Regions:
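N-terminal accessory scaffold of Fe(II)-dependent oxygenases
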Residues: 1-153, 161-200
Length: 200
């Protein structure tokens, strides 16, 4: 699949009908993000199991607990903060740029719950082109930049802000690991969900 996207042409007649091929790589990017392995075919877990050994890192998780992120060059996840757990990310194909910001930077990143997504707090700042006249404190934000290459694993601490962009056609998997103080954060998220759904 990754080779197919990189060449911008189908490798088999079956893939010709894949929706990504309706768009030109130079002007569009495609992102299959946040896809839970358990919801995909069982083949995904079988293929990933020997590659992604979360238990070797001390986690009580296996490949079926993972989430898949597959995208073309330029695909990205906007700057956000996960509200609970820590994040382990394994880069399997291609490269991804990560911009990480400490939770201490929250005031500089202008957090918002719009759009609402359970367990995510977004930043109003577009880190690719920050508008410092609207968000002046964003000029003070100090990111840590990391480029993940195949075989790399990144540990994202709890509540750290992150922006992620594929530098090439990219495949990565991640797993969220619970922390002892997640119960309180999950309760806050449940309250936020009730409030948001009551407004709909």
């Amino acid at each position: 699949f990754c080779a197919c996207l990189t060449n911008n042409r189908p490798l088999s007649p079956r893939l010709f009908f894949f929706p990504f091929f309706l768009f030109i790589r130079k002007t569009h990017w495609a992102y299959a993000d946040y896809k839970h392995v358990k919801e995909l075919s069982s083949d995904w877990a079988n293929v990933l199991q020997p590659i992604v050994g979360w238990s070797a890192l001390g986690c009580n998780k296996d490949a079926s607990d993972s989430t898949v992120w597959l995208g073309t060059e330029g695909s990205h996840t906007p700057l956000h903060q996960d509200t609970y757990g820590v994040n382990l990310v394994a880069q399997l194909h291609g490269r991804k740029k990560w911009l990480l910001f400490s939770p201490d930077e929250t005031v500089n990143l202008y957090s918002t719950r719009i759009p609402y997504e359970e367990s995510s707090v977004f930043s109003q700042v577009d880190v690719r082109a920050p508008n410092t006249s609207i968000y002046p404190l964003s000029a003070e934000a100090q990111p840590i930049e990391v480029t993940l290459e195949p075989g790399d694993i990144l540990y994202v601490p709890k509540h750290w802000w992150h922006f992620v962009e594929a530098l090439d056609t990219s495949l990565s998997v991640n797993v969220w690991v619970d922390t002892p103080d997640d119960a309180g954060d999950r309760a806050k998220e449940a309250i936020a969900r009730v409030l948001v759904t009551s407004l709909a």
